[in-house]
Amino acid sequence: MAENPIWEQIGASFIQQYYQTFDADRTQLAVIYTDASCLTWEGQQYHGKAAIVEKLSLLPFQKIQHSITSQDHQPTPDSCIISMVVGQLKADDDPIMGFHQVFLLKNIQDAWVCTNDMFRLALHNFG
């Protein structure tokens, strides 16, 4: 069986580390962001490592668990990796909810960091 392309290996490794860290202690995610990183969380924009970590730290739950349904990774023309994640999460005693998240990863000084991060709960309005 052929080995996965390097961008898929890097993307999958990043995703695994991201959600393990998020579920255990999301304040530790500061190491993956830079001062130029951008986060869009449910339509709200945050710029820079400090603002992103503050937002993630102030999310209104004590415990959370993510379950990844699928993930896709692609190389970009400027040597970055774009990763899309679909999954479910359970926060405290709330019902299980679906979510979508997209990351743009860039190699800076031999470390993969997240320059762009977009998150949405998978909520649908039928009617």
UniProtKB/Swiss-Prot annotation:
Keyword Hydrolase carried by entry: no
PROSITE patterns associated with the record: NTF2_DOMAIN
Signal peptide positions (record): none
Any single Gene Ontology cellular-component annotation: cytoplasm
CDD domains: NTF2 (cd00780)
GO BP annotation list: protein import into nucleus
Residue span, NTF2 domain: 10-121
Subcellular location, principal: cytoplasm
Keywords attached to this entry: Cytoplasm, Protein transport, Transport
Domain of life of the native organism: Eukaryota
Gene Ontology molecular function terms on file: nuclear import signal receptor activity
The keyword Protein transport is assigned to this record: yes
Location in the cell: Cytoplasm
Function: Facilitates protein transport into the nucleus. Interacts with the nucleoporin p62 and with Ran. Acts at a relatively late stage of nuclear protein import, subsequent to the initial docking of nuclear import ligand at the nuclear envelope. Could be part of a multicomponent system of cytosolic factors that assemble at the pore complex during nuclear import.
Subunit relationships: Homodimer.
UniProt name for this protein: Nuclear transport factor 2
